[in-house]
Amino acid sequence: VNRKTVRIAMNGVTGRMGYRQHLVRSILALREQGGLDLGDGTVLWPEPVLVGRREHALRALAERHDLEHISTDVDTVLADPTVDIYFDAQVTSAREEAIKKAIAAGKHIYTEKPTATGLEGALELARLAQNAGIKHGVVQDKLFLPGLLKLKRLIDGGFFGRILSVRGEFGYWVFEGDWQPAQRPSWNYRAEDGGGIVVDMFPHWEYVLHELFGRVRSVQAVATTHIPQRWDENGKPYDATADDAAYGIFELDGGVIAQINSSWAVRVNRDELVEFQVDGTEGSAVAGLRNCRVQHRSATPKPVWNPDIPATYAFRDQWQEVPDNTEFDNGFKAQWELFLRHVYADAPYHWDLLAGARGVQLAELGLQSSTEGRRIDVPEIAL
């Protein structure tokens, strides 16, 4: 077996997602399983180079996980010819410039979304990457959730007949930070720092809708700030200038209507933190992070509206759980594996910087729709 060491500059791994999902659950998990077998006698061995601004935090991570390489100097890391891939999980406002430098240095790019703070910047990154001839990918983790993989299986199997509509509910109560610490970083709630639920979640909804149901043709959204003041990591009050909730209606190719509510100011009365209900002529499904329930046309009850008597049906009990039928790996790790196969075995991979730009576009148009109070068409973008 030929073991090939792959050095990956990982910028932003001291943050919640960068650390938990990308470093621990993806790259270190790949090392724990002995590397990634490409199937041709080559096993890829990922060697992370932890990059960030705070040396003490990087050192603590390296010691905790027995890793050798850390750096607070991105330029030096990018100048190192042994580093193949640049990964970015920084705050959005710092991402664009860093990715440009990495492309100029000839590194393959794998990045969190949103790829840039605006569509022009996102398209420029895609163009630069294409012209440089490098491989590039954008994290689209929701597609790899067990619940959505089951939903895709239902779609591919023709379960729904003609799909009519999609309803999504996402969110939970993020504490304000005064009497209980907030479970999300304070920059998420400051527009000037790249915060806001639209720029965070609409890129996710773009690829979920696009991949499963059809391209988004129009958006009509209301974005608002329900909680105008929050308290930061040091217990200091600050003005929440970014939107913390967004209510969107999306028209898709083929006439499917999607309606998705996203909120950090909602209390959860559903089985999971995100749920999508899909209704079709032949059946319906409700998919979350892990689970998926269905109701077929032949088993659909026939309720009659009568407010004078208690409900005779326990409606939730009339849905059937979709079995796993397979083992599901961590979604971030699954996508890392696909990207590494793309880079080193030329395997197909279409979640690239152009796909990332579509997500930025939808967020931008969603905010424009909210500001102008109107429905906005979503034009197709190309390089």
Which residues make up each language-model segment?
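Short, conserved SAM-binding/catalytic segment
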Residues: A60-L67, E124, L128-A129
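Predominantly a Rossmann-like dinucleotide-binding segment in NAD(P)-dependent oxidoreductases
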Residues: K142-A240, G373
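N-terminal Rossmann-like dinucleotide-binding module
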Residues: V1-H65
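C-terminal glycine/acidic-rich active-site capping loop/insertion
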Residues: W231-N234, Y238-D239, Y247, E251-L252, ...
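Glycine-rich phosphate/pyrophosphate-binding beta-alpha loops
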Residues: P203, S262-N269
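Beta-strand-loop-alpha-helix segment that lines the small-molecule cofactor/substrate pocket
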Residues: D84-I85, V91-T92, E96-L143, G158
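C-terminal capping/lid region of NAD(P)-dependent oxidoreductase domains
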Residues: R3, I134, G161-S165, Q368-L383
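Short acidic low-complexity segments
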Residues: H69-P81
